[in-house]
Amino acid sequence: WTDEKITALVRRIRAAYPDCAITLSIGEKSRQAYQAFFDAGADRYLLRHETADCAHYGKLHPPAQTLENRMRCLFDLKEIGYQTGAGMMIGAPYQTADTLASDFAFLAKLRPQMVGMGPFLPHRDTPFREFPAGSAEQTLYLLSLVRLMLPDALLPATTALGTLDGRGRQEGVLSGCNVVMPNLSPMAVR
């Protein structure tokens, strides 16, 4: 999809549903594209920062993707006026206590309106297939810290948390999450 097609689609959705929030999560774009989507009627944009540590970011992404550009995107979104969502996977490959401290410092600086945090889940078709899954317990603990740090943020209890622990989403709510996103797709097409 081109930026122009997305802009046109957002404009049509806004015209048909003027009272609904329109949330986009379509990755890194130019400031001009973000502005066009916003002007067409988009309200929210989700773009996980993934890590605020440059060396860690380099281990998770191809060389063409940079932490500097990811940060530029997030600050552009905030400056334009979006309700902005950031976040990271907990227990991601190469993540350390120091990288998590950098993440929390970044969240304190950005002050996003939404924070998406869920446990890392390895997939067999990725370079990270041999890494262990993140911990539900650590994820819940860190979610509670985000709730204390950003008391008004939208904080989802993620599907990944429910995948690791059958009561993960309920525990997420008890840890400070205030958004639940159930998967309503039929099992045959998930």
Protein language model features and the residues they cover:
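Catalytic cores of alpha/beta
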Residues: 30-39, 93-108, 162-175
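Core AdoMet radical
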Residues: 1-3, 9-74, 83-90, 113-116
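Generic structural signal for well-ordered alpha-helices
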Residues: 6-11, 34, 71-74, 104-107, ...
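Conserved mixed alpha/beta catalytic, RNA-binding, or beta-rich assembly cores of soluble enzyme
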Residues: 83, 88, 98-99, 154
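Auxiliary Fe-S-binding modules of radical SAM enzymes
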Residues: 15-16, 108-190
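Alpha-helix N-cap and loop-to-helix initiation/capping positions
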Residues: 1-5, 61-69, 95-102, 130-138
